[in-house]
Design a protein with these regions (language model features):
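One-carbon transfer enzymes
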Residues: 1-113
């Protein structure tokens, strides 16, 4: 079973669909942790209601790579296999992308122009 780590900054609407797909066994995965850089992001509430471990990490007054290293530690703590970016409104550092090479998927609700 794939252990998912979710990074999100917004409502996390797509998280609901992923939870439903897991519950109906359409998706053979487990959401191990949800991390947000926005304290009041509804994605954290979705995680709480569904009893998914969740963390808030502020990105303010911190260099991008240091922020990414804090996220990295949490993802390792939960033995994450694959990261889903669901409305994550931060640009990830080159370092983070190398560490998680081919293990990051960006979920975007529409086509970009």
């Amino acid at each position: 079973m794939i252990r998912l780590g979710v990074l999100g900054s917004t409502k996390g609407t797509d998280l609901g669909a992923i939870i439903q797909a897991i519950d109906t066994e359409e998706l053979k995965a487990k959401i191990s942790v949800v991390v947000s850089n926005q304290k009041n992001a509804y994605i954290l509430e979705r995680a709480r209601v569904n009893k998914i471990p969740h963390h808030y990490i502020s990105h303010k007054n911190e260099k991008r790579e240091m922020f990414d290293q804090r996220i990295h530690k949490i993802l390792l703590q939960y033995n994450v296999d694959l990261i889903l970016l669901i409305g994550f409104m931060r640009i990830l550092s080159d370092w983070f992308c190398r560490e998680w090479n081919e293990k990051i998927l960006n979920v975007h609700p529409s086509l970009l122009p």
